[in-house]
Amino acid sequence: MPAVFLLLRSLVVRLFGSRLAASGVQLLRRILTTATGHLGTVLRNIWERISSQQSKEAILGCVLCLLNMHKKVDN
């Protein structure tokens, strides 16, 4: 009999653990989507305030450099 209870307990723990993990993933996805939207809006507003073409080109150059560095680390 105790073996049956241990089996049931492990099944219940797995069930609740998987549901909790799924809920956590959904919450994280919603938070990241919202944060990305806000960040995009902020960056767009900053970009519109920059009037100098040279400044915009310098910023884009820095962003491309950072992206290339990140790509090299992944490989």
Curated annotation (Swiss-Prot):
Q: Which UniProt keywords apply?
A: Cell membrane, Membrane, Myogenesis, Transmembrane, Transmembrane helix
Which family would the database say this protein is a member of? Answer: Belongs to the MYMX family.
**Protein's name in the database:** Protein myomixer
- Domain statement: The AxLyCxL motif is required for myoblast fusion.
Q: Which positions, given as ranges, span the membrane?
A: 6-28
* Encoding gene per record: mymx
Tell me what topology the record assigns in the membrane: Single-pass membrane protein
Give the top-rank taxon of the lineage listed in the UniProt record for this protein: Eukaryota
Q: When this gene is knocked out, what is seen? A: Abolished myoblast fusion.
Name the species this protein comes from. Danio rerio (Zebrafish)
What this protein is reported to do is described as: Myoblast-specific protein that mediates myoblast fusion, an essential step for the formation of multi-nucleated muscle fibers. Involved in membrane fusion downstream of the lipid mixing step mediated by mymk. Acts by generating membrane stresses via its extracellular C-terminus, leading to drive fusion pore formation.
Gene Ontology CC entries for this record: plasma membrane
* Tissue expression notes: Specifically expressed in the developing myotome.
